[in-house]
C-alpha cells in the first residue's frame, strides 16, 4: 500500500460493503421520495371523497411500506456504514503506528507533542468523515440525480432536461463555489486548531514552569487571544455557510414552484391526473435533502487532504528506515562499537556530527560528554539504528547498526533519564528485560541493584503495583528497577543516557556506584553533560558542535587540559 493513499486502498479492500452502504443509502432516499409521492397522491385521492376505502387501500399500504422501508434501510445503512468505518479507522491506526515505530526514537526531535497528539487523534478521526460525510452521501446524491432526471424523462424530456440544468446548480455549481471560497478558510482553521492543540498540550505538560515563573496569566491571555482569533475565523466561515444554505433553500423553493407550474400545465393539457400534482410537488422535498449536504461535503476535502499530508509526514525519514536486503547476523561475543568519520545532519540543516570517530571495545567504559545539542542524543540514535549517517559508519563488530534491525536489542540496552514503568507489578516490570526469566532470576537482579530488601518490606512484595509511569517510587528507585531489567536483558553493551538527571547528589553517587558495580565486565557508554564521577570511565570523549574537542583518560585530561580541569572542578569542587 502506497503511503500517499489513505482512501482508495480501503475502498478496494471493502468494496462489497461499500456498495452495500451506497445501495442502502439509495434505498433510504428513494423510500423517502416514494413515501412523499404516495402521501401526496393519497391526500389528493382522499380529498375526492372516494366511495369505498378500498379505492385508496393500495396507497395506504404503500405509505406504510415506504415509511417502514425508509426507517429500516436508514438504520441498516448506519449500522453497516459505521461498522466499515470503525474497521477502517482501526486499520488506519495500526498502519500509522507501523509508520511511526521504525523512527520512534527520533519522534521528539521531529514533532512537538501537541502535533503528534493531533495526528494520532484528530487527523485519524477526521478521515472517517471523508467516508461518512463525503464519499457515501456524494455517490448516493449523484445516483439520485441521474435516476430522478431519467424518471422524469418518461413524463416530459424537455422538462427533465430543464430540471437537470436546474439541479446542476445545486449538485455541482454550489459545491464547487463552496470549495473555492472555504478552501483558504478551512486551511487557516485547521492550522490554527493544530497550533492551539500544540500550545495547550505544551502548557499542560509544563504547567509547573508557568506557575513557578509567575507568567501563567500571560500565557492564558495569549492563548485566549489566539482562541478568539480562531473563533472569529470560524464565525466568518459559518456566516458564509448560512448565506450559502439560504441561497440553496431559495433554489429549492424555486424548484418547488417550477414543479408546481409544470404539473399544473400537464394537468391542464390532460397529461396528468389532478391527484398527481401534490405527489410530484412533495417528492421534491426528500430529493433536495439529499443534494443540500453536498456543498458541505466537498468543502471539507481540503481538510482531508491536509490530514493525509500530516499523516504521511510521520513516515520515518529515509535515513531512519533505510535498510538493505539480506539479514545481517551479529556475533555477540566480544562486541566492538565503532564510529568511523561519522557525519550526520537533519533535513539538510547544519551538521550535528562532523567526522566523529571513536572505538569502544568489549569491557571498556567510556564517558561521552557535551552540552545539550552537541550531538550526544544523535549518537545514541545512530547506535540504535534509528538513524543512518550521511557519511562514515556506525558498526557493531563491523556490521552497520542500521542493518541490524531487531538484533540491536540483543546487543545494546539503554538506561535513560526517565525509564518507563508500566502500571503493573514490580515483578512484571523487571521481567520485561527477559520474558523467560523466573521469579528467582528477578529477585537475584533486584538484589544486585540493592532493591530487594526494600521490595520485600512492601505489603505485597514483588507483586506491588508501581502505578502509572512508576509514580509510586522515587527517581532513584525507578532507575534501579530499570537497571534490574537491564541485568535480565544481559546485553554486551550498556548505554547510560544521563540516568542521574533530577536526582540529588547523594542518590546520584549511590546509583552510579551500583551501576558500575553490577555492570562490571560490560561495555559501557555513559552519555552525560557533567563530569561528576567520570573518573570511573576508562576514557573520556568531549563532544562539541559535532566534533571531538577533547579525548583521553581522566588522569591525562586533568593533567594536560586546562579547560577540562576547570570544568571538572566546577562539577567536583576541590575540598
Curated annotation (Swiss-Prot):
The chain crosses the membrane at residues 17-37, 53-73, 135-155, 161-181, 246-266, 275-295. CDD domains: ABCC_cytochrome_bd. It is a multi-pass membrane protein. ATP binds at residues 370-377. GO terms for cellular component: plasma membrane. One of its GO terms (molecular function) is ATP hydrolysis activity. Its main location: membrane. GO terms for biological process: amino acid transport; cell redox homeostasis; glutathione transmembrane transport. Keywords: Amino-acid transport, ATP-binding, Cell membrane, Membrane, Nucleotide-binding, Translocase, Transmembrane, Transmembrane helix, Transport. Its EC number is 7.4.2.-. Residues 19-303 form the ABC transmembrane type-1 domain. Pfam families: ABC_membrane, ABC_tran. Residues 337-570 form the ABC transporter domain. It comes from the Bacteria. It is found in: Cell membrane. It catalyses: L-cysteine(in) + ATP + H2O = L-cysteine(out) + ADP + phosphate + H(+); glutathione(in) + ATP + H2O = glutathione(out) + ADP + phosphate + H(+). In CydD the ATP-binding domain (NBD) and the transmembrane domain (TMD) are fused. Forms a heterodimer with CydC. PANTHER family: ATP-BINDING CASSETTE SUB-FAMILY B MEMBER 10, MITOCHONDRIAL (PTHR43394:SF1), ATP-DEPENDENT PERMEASE MDL1, MITOCHONDRIAL (PTHR43394). Part of the ABC transporter complex CydDC that exports the reduced low-molecular-weight thiols cysteine and glutathione from the cell. Export of these thiol-containing redox-active molecules may be crucial for redox homeostasis, permitting correct assembly of various respiratory complexes and formation of correct disulfide bonds in secreted proteins. CydD contains transmembrane domains (TMD), which form a pore in the membrane, and an ATP-binding domain (NBD), which is responsible for energy generation. Belongs to the ABC transporter superfamily. Cysteine exporter (TC 3.A.1.129.1) family. This is Glutathione/L-cysteine transport system ATP-binding/permease protein CydD. The gene is cydD.
Amino acid at each position: 500500500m502506497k503511503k500517499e493513499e489513505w482512501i482508495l486502498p480501503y475502498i478496494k479492500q471493502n468494496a462489497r460493503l461499500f456498495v452495500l452502504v451506497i445501495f442502502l443509502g439509495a434505498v433510504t432516499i428513494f423510500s423517502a421520495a416514494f413515501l412523499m409521492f404516495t402521501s401526496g397522491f393519497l391526500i389528493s385521492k382522499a380529498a375526492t371523497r372516494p366511495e369505498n376505502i378500498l379505492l385508496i387501500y393500495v396507497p395506504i399500504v404503500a405509505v406504510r411500506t415506504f415509511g417502514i422501508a425508509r426507517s429500516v434501510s436508514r438504520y441498516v445503512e448506519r449500522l453497516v456504514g459505521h461498522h466499515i468505518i470503525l474497521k477502517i479507522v482501526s486499520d488506519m491506526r495500526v498502519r500509522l503506528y507501523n509508520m511511526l515505530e521504525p523512527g520512534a526514537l527520533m519522534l521528539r526531535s521531529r514533532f512537538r507533542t501537541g502535533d503528534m497528539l493531533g495526528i494520532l487523534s484528530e487527523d485519524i478521526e477526521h478521515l472517517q468523515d471523508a467516508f461518512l460525510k463525503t464519499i457515501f452521501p456524494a455517490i448516493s446524491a449523484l445516483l439520485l440525480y441521474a435516476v430522478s432526471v431519467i424518471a422524469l424523462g418518461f413524463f416530459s424530456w424537455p422538462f427533465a432536461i430543464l430540471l437537470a440544468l436546474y439541479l446542476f446548480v445545486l449538485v455541482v455549481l454550489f459545491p464547487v463555489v463552496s470549495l473555492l471560497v472555504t478552501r483558504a478558510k478551512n486551511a487557516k482553521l485547521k492550522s490554527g486548531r493544530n497550533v492551539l492543540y500544540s500550545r495547550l498540550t505544551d502548557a499542560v505538560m509544563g504547567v509547573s514552569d508557568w506557575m513557578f515563573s509567575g507568567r501563567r496569566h500571560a500565557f492564558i491571555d495569549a492563548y485566549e487571544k489566539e482562541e478568539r482569533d480562531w473563533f472569529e475565523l470560524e464565525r466568518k466561515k459559518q456566516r458564509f455557510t448560512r448565506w450559502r444554505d439560504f441561497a440553496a433553500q431559495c433554489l429549492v423553493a424555486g424548484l418547488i414552484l417550477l414543479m408546481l407550474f409544470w404539473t399544473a400545465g400537464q394537468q391542464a393539457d390532460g397529461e396528468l391526473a389532478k391527484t398527481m400534482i401534490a405527489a410530484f410537488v412533495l417528492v421534491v422535498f426528500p430529493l433536495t435533502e439529499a443534494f443540500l449536504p453536498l456543498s458541505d461535503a466537498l468543502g471539507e476535502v481540503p481538510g482531508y487532504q491536509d490530514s493525509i499530508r500530516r499523516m504521511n509526514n510521520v513516515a520515518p525519514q529515509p535515513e531512519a528506515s533505510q535498510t538493505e536486503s539480506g539479514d545481517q547476523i551479529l556475533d555477540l561475543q566480544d562486541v566492538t562499537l565503532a564510529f568511523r568519520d561519522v557525519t550526520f545532519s537533519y533535513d539538510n540543516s547544519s551538521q550535528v556530527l562532523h567526522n566523529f570517530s571513536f572505538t569502544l571495545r568489549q569491557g571498556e567504559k567510556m564517558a561521552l560528554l557535551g552540552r545539550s545539542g552537541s550531538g550526544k542524543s544523535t549518537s545514541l540514535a545512530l547506535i540504535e539504528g534509528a538513524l543512518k549517517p550521511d557519511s562514515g559508519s556506525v558498526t557493531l563488530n563491523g556490521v552497520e547498526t542500521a542493518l541490524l534491525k531487531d538484533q540491536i536489542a540483543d546487543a545494546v540496552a539503554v538506561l535513560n533519564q526517565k525509564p518507563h514503568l508500566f502500571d503493573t507489578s514490580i515483578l512484571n516490570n523487571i521481567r520485561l528485560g527477559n520474558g523467560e526469566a523466573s521469579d528467582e532470576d528477578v529477585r537475584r537482579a533486584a538484589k544486585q541493584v540493592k532493591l530487594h530488601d526494600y521490595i520485600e518490606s512492601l505489603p505485597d512484595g514483588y507483586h506491588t503495583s508501581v502505578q502509572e509511569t512508576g509514580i509510586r517510587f522515587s527517581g532513584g528507585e525507578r532507575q534501579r528497577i530499570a537497571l534490574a531489567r537491564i541485568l535480565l536483558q544481559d546485553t554486551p553493551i550498556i548505554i547510560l543516557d544521563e540516568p542521574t538527571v533530577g536526582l540529588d547528589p547523594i542518590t546520584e553517587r549511590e546509583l552510579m556506584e551500583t551501576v558500575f558495580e553490577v555492570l562490571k565486565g560490560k561495555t559501557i557508554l555513559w552519555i552525560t553533560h557533567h563530569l561528576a564521577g567520570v573518573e570511573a570511565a576508562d576514557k573520556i570523549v568531549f563532544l562539541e558542535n559535532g566534533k571531538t574537542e577533547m579525548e583521553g583518560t581522566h588522569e591525562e585530561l586533568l593533567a594536560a587540559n586546562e579547560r577540562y580541569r576547570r570544568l571538572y572542578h566546577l562539577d567536583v569542587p576541590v575540598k
